[in-house]
């Protein structure tokens, strides 16, 4: 069972930039990125699973904490299939973080007041 993953370089750059401009910690941004990716009606594409590993190293406990089983269930619902532990972490978690970071970047760039905009998105979850 894996306990660490490395994001893509692009995801790390996005998380670093938003972390610096919004003063939110990386682990908070990672959870928001996962939420935005899961919120998407689009399934993960094959290319989402083939991003580089040149970004930040993240610990499983930091990402999912006590809600590990909940994250796995949400990802299984999104994928519409059972995920083994090896598929869930790091494969699916990394894919959702990398895709979600891009979505988070779009929300931050075009959403006006970032935190207010994210709370408005929550109403649609």
What is the role of each PLM region?
Residues 1, 70-77, 90-101:
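Short, highly charged low-complexity linear segments
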Residues 1, 8-28, 32, 55-61, ...:
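Surface-exposed, Lys/Arg-rich phosphate-binding patches that contact polyanionic backbones
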Residues 26-34, 67, 71, 89, ...:
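Short runs of predominantly hydrophobic/aromatic residues within well-ordered alpha helices
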């Amino acid at each position: 069972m894996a306990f660490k993953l490395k994001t893509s370089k692009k995801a790390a750059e996005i998380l670093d930039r938003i972390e610096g401009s919004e003063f939110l910690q990386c682990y908070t941004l990672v959870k928001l990125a996962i939420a935005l990716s899961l919120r998407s009606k689009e399934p993960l594409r094959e290319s989402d699973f083939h991003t580089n590993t040149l970004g930040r190293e993240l610990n499983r406990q930091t990402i999912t904490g006590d809600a590990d089983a909940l994250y796995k269930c949400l990802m299984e619902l999104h994928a519409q299939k059972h995920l083994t532990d090896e598929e869930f972490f790091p494969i699916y978690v990394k894919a959702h973080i990398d895709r979600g970071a891009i979505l988070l970047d779009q929300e931050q760039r075009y959403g006006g007041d970032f935190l207010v905009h994210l709370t408005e998105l929550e109403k649609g979850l």
